[in-house]
């Protein structure tokens, strides 16, 4: 199993690198146009919930198809596999990476935040947890749904990107080369754990997502 996981991680390096390139391009535009932080925050809370939905769908569907388990256990697996991974990838890792560069970063956990989201007037935790519930429901009742891994990579990349610009203050342009590496790592390991390691743990055949 470890050999297969290693091969899958190597296989997904090009996907993740391509996603990181789009993230760096977006960050350059955000910097050049002096995009306000509240806009970055709104974008973060667009892509982060999408990331949660996608992860919840995949994780729940895999567990649902291959384990005849009780509903409560399926919900726990779907929730932890989505909110846990997305929080790590989109919030915790960008914060730690930003602090390692001595960037002024605000530590923010969306799944428990009571702050009101700009433009939507809804608490952050409501949006994130609702996204997880939606993903779990879809994965439970439509377990044969398949998505390209590249979609997950792009959504996660953009969520991580806006995790930097929404909660960090810095002159981003000189940092773009380093941030490319950081974006790559923030997406590659968590997303591959969610989309690859989970399938290899629960599925005896092919993973539940399609590689395109």
Residue spans for each PLM region:
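Transmembrane helix-loop junctions in multi-pass membrane proteins
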Residues: 26-39, 65-69, 84, 88-97, ...
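Alpha-helical transmembrane segments of polytopic membrane proteins
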Residues: 44-55, 118-129, 182-187
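C-terminal transmembrane helix-loop-helix hairpin of multi-pass membrane proteins
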Residues: 3-19, 140-212
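N-terminal topogenic module of multi-pass integral membrane proteins
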Residues: 1-72
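Hydrophobic cores of alpha-helical transmembrane segments in multi-pass inner/ER membrane proteins
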Residues: 52-63, 129-135, 184, 190-200
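Membrane-interface interhelical loops and short amphipathic "cap" helices
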Residues: 31-44, 97-109, 172-179, 184
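Membrane-proximal helix-loop-helix units in multi-pass membrane proteins
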Residues: 80, 84-160
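Membrane-interface alpha-helices at helix entry/exit sites of multi-pass transporters
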Residues: 68-77, 211
